[in-house]
C-alpha cells in the first residue's frame, strides 16, 4: 500500500495492481514515492525501456522510450540516463542481466555496460535476499555463458561474491531449479548462508556440491531413492551432470516399499529393543540384494 501496490487474487492466481507514481527520493535501495496521474511520468521511473511500455484494453501500445525497437534489436537499455537509473536502485544492475538472459543472442549496449562498471560497488548496499531473488531468475534464462562473461568483465560477480567456474556448462544442460545452475558455478555451499537462501535451497545446494564429482548411474540413483533419499535431489543431480534421459527416468520412477515393519518382527516373538532395528537393517540388505523382489513372508523366513 505504501508504494501504491495491492495484490488481487483471481481464481487462485495473484495479480499486482499498481497506481501511477513518481520517485521523489531514492537511496540506491528503495524510494519515497508520490502518486500521480501522468502515464509517461510513471513510465519514466521504470528500469528498462521495454519494461516502460503499457497497453490499454483496446490493445493500443504506449511506448514512450522506444522499447519495442530495443526488443526487436535484441538490446536492453535503461530509460534515459543509465547511471541515474542504476543509482536509484542498484539492484537494477542484476535486473539488466536477468532480462538479457531472456533474449535470444542479446546485443550488448556499450553505454549501459560502462554505467554498470562505474556503479557496480553499489550492489554492496543491496540485501542478500534481493540479490538471490534476481540471480535465481537469471539462472533460469539462456545465454548464461555470455551473461556471466559480461558480469565478470563489469565486476558484478565479484561484487556479489559469485564464482563462475564451469559457466559454459550452463548452456549445455537443462534443469528445473535455479539451485542446479548455481551448483554448477560454485565449489562449496557457503554462498547459501551469505544469500540467506531457504532451508530447502540450502539442503539442495549442499547435496549437489557434495556429489558433484560422483557420476550418477540409474541403479545407484534408484537405490538411493528406495533407501529414503529425496527423489527431487537425485533428479537435480542428474540434470546438473547433463544426464537428461536419466533425470526423465527418475521422474517416472516409483520406488517399491519395504514390506516388513517392526511390528511384524514383534508378532514373530522378537523382544522389543535395539534388536528389532538391527534385524530390519539386515532384512533391508537382503531385500536390496534380491533387487527388491522378496515378499514380506520370504523376508521373514530369512530370520
PLM feature spans:
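Catalytic cores of the polymerase beta-like nucleotidyltransferase superfamily
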Residues: 1-303
Amino acid at each position: 500500500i505504501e508504494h501504491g501496490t495491492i495484490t488481487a487474487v483471481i481464481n487462485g492466481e495473484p495479480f499486482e495492481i499498481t497506481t501511477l507514481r513518481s520517485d521523489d527520493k531514492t537511496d540506491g535501495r528503495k524510494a519515497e514515492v508520490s502518486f500521480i496521474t501522468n502515464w509517461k511520468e510513471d513510465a519514466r521511473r521504470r528500469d528498462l525501456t521495454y519494461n516502460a511500455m503499457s497497453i490499454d484494453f483496446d490493445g493500443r501500445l504506449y511506448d514512450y522510450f522506444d522499447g519495442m525497437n530495443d526488443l526487436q534489436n535484441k538490446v536492453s537499455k535503461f530509460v534515459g540516463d543509465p547511471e541515474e537509473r542504476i543509482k536509484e536502485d542498484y539492484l537494477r544492475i542484476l535486473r539488466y542481466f536477468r532480462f538479457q538472459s531472456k533474449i535470444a543472442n542479446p546485443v550488448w549496449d556499450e553505454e549501459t555496460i560502462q554505467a554498470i562498471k562505474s556503479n557496480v560497488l553499489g550492489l554492496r548496499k543491496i540485501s542478500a535476499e534481493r540479490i538471490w531473488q534476481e540471480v535465481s531468475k537469471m539462472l533460469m534464462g539462456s545465454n548464461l555463458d555470455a551473461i556471466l562473461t559480461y558480469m565478470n568483465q563489469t565486476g558484478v560477480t565479484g561484487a556479489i561474491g559469485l564464482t563462475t567456474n564451469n559457466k559454459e556448462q550452463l548452456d549445455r544442460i537443462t534443469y528445473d531449479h535455479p539451485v542446479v545452475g548455481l551448483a554448477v558455478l560454485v565449489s562449496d555451499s557457503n554462498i547459501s548462508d551469505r544469500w540467506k537462501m531457504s532451508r530447502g535451497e540450502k539442503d539442495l545446494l549442499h547435496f549437489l556440491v557434495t556429489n558433484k564429482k560422483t557420476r550418477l548411474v540409474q541403479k545407484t540413483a534408484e537405490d538411493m531413492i528406495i533407501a529414503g533419499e529425496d527423489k527431487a535431489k537425485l533428479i537435480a543431480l542428474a540434470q546438473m551432470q547433463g544426464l537428461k534421459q536419466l533425470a526423465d527416468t527418475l521422474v517416472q520412477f516409483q520406488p517399491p516399499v519395504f514390506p516388513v515393519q517392526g511390528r511384524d518382527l514383534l508378532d514373530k516373538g522378537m523382544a522389543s529393543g535395539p534388536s528389532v532395528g538391527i534385524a530390519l537393517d539386515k532384512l533391508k540388505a537382503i531385500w536390496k540384494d534380491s533387487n527388491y523382489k522378496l515378499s514380506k513372508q520370504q523376508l521373514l523366513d530369512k530370520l
